[in-house]
Regions:
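A glycine-rich, Thr/Ser-enriched phosphate-binding loop motif common to dinucleotide/cofactor-binding enzymes
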Residues: 1-12
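Acidic, low-complexity intrinsically disordered regions
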Residues: 3, 62, 97, 182, ...
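Solvent-exposed, flexible loop/coil residues
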Residues: 4-5, 83, 148-149
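Intrinsically disordered, low-complexity regions enriched in small/polar residues
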Residues: 8-9, 34, 68, 81, ...
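Conserved nucleotide-cofactor-binding alpha/beta core module
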Residues: 11, 15-112, 117-121
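SAM/dcSAM-binding transferase cores
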Residues: 119-204
């Protein structure tokens, strides 16, 4: 599938609205950040995060025509937005879900994130925030470049084990402390775990 068609299908699932605030992790040279900026319009905002300084400079130049988009040369995994985001789009494969992303989600916010193994294969999950609940929906299978800062060997091994036990489509919710992992746990990370049980809240 053409990558532009693939990303268009993912952006459709986010159901972005005019005026919304989006954080784009792994912006590269800014192509998809520009599309996000066009979708949210002049009243919206896109914060494009890129860890590579050279790519961040190119993205700034390429996004000059979209004043609602700004580029930050930073590690998107550790970045704290400081204000809630309506949508967070992660453009590289991770083995870990950053607690900072979850903390940055506004009420009814959405997080689109690819969990991938050592071979860069995995799936995009669409995580929503509904009060204290985080319903999760499978969005797409993927093969995508790894996210610098969003992976470690131990988490990669845990993810590989989870993928061998059950399909991504079994995941129904994300849970956070003080709720402890139980027998519905698909994968656990620091400050979060994925469950095959439905969330107490609306569907994502």
């Amino acid at each position: 599938m053409d990558s532009r068609v693939f990303w268009a299908s993912l952006f459709d699932q986010l159901e972005l609205k005019r005026g919304e605030r989006v954080i784009h992790v792994g912006a590269g040279a800014g192509y998809y950040s520009a599309i996000l900026a066009a979708i949210v319009g002049p009243a919206g905002r896109v914060i494009a995060l890129e860890i590579d300084n050279g790519l961040a400079r190119r993205a700034s130049e390429n996004l000059a025509a979209w004043p609602q988009a700004s580029v930050v040369a930073a590690d998107g995994f550790a970045y704290s937005a400081g204000e809630p985001a309506d949508a967070i789009v992660v453009n590289a494969g991770v083995t870990l879900i950053a607690p900072a992303w979850l903390d940055s989600m506004a009420e009814n916010g959405r997080l689109l994130v690819p969990l991938t193994n050592a071979n860069w294969q995995g799936a995009f999950l669409l995580i929503a925030r509904r009060g204290g609940a985080y319903p999760v929906r499978f969005a797409s299978w993927t093969g995508i470049i790894p996210c610098i800062g969003g992976r470690d060997a131990e988490a990669e091994a845990r993810l590989a084990d989870a993928m061998a036990r059950a399909d991504f489509t079994a995941i129904q919710s994300l849970r956070r402390p003080p709720e402890a992992p139980d027998d519905t746990c698909w994968l656990a990370g620091e400050g979060w775990w994925l469950s095959t049980a439905t969330a107490e809240g609306a569907e994502p």
